[in-house]
Curated annotation (Swiss-Prot):
One of its GO terms (cellular component) is small ribosomal subunit. It comes from the Bacteria. Coiled coil: none annotated. Belongs to the universal ribosomal protein uS9 family. The lineage of its organism: Bacteria, Bacillati, Actinomycetota, Actinomycetes, Mycobacteriales. GO terms for biological process: translation. This is Small ribosomal subunit protein uS9. NCBIfam families: PRK00132.1. Keywords: Ribonucleoprotein, Ribosomal protein. HAMAP family: Ribosomal_uS9_B (MF_00532_B). One of its GO terms (molecular function) is RNA binding. PROSITE patterns: RIBOSOMAL_S9. The gene is rpsI.
Amino acid sequence: MSEPIQNENVESNVADAADIAAATAATEEFTNTIGDAISTSTEEETFEAAPAVLDGPIWTVGRRKRAIVRVRMVAGSGEITCNGRTLEDYFPNKLHQQLIKAPLVLLGREGQFDIHANLGGGGPTGQAGAFRLAIARALNAYNPAERPTLKKAGFLTRDARAVERKKAGLHKARRAPQYSKR
């Protein structure tokens, strides 16, 4: 068997104020040298992109739940057409209209483009969410310099939530039959 190691200077393991001050100074000096190696400039480099010119239609696709929306965006007066009908006729709910127009309003481009959409599948909320994603993707394709603004607002993120499938032996996706102890 091995004998326990004897520490002759047990009392020297206790740090005094001078040791703590020296360690703090060394730590600060070390972190300052690390900080110098990493460029942490607070000024963000912004590149002014040339004014984007829309030479042809921009085609994009947006999906949400079961809805799929195909959008064709062209330069125009701000008319939005959904399956041959106006936006107000197709989406009478003002909340859905605001949801769809949100990327255009954020970038201040409400009356700049004509948007023609082919909507299919899902319900009104899913179609509105898919429409918003398709418009945001079209605006991103038109001017990639505005991508950070759209990304920060969450307009370029595809909402992956969908209905969970029903499982065998359960009433619904997670609803189990009532438990009976006896």
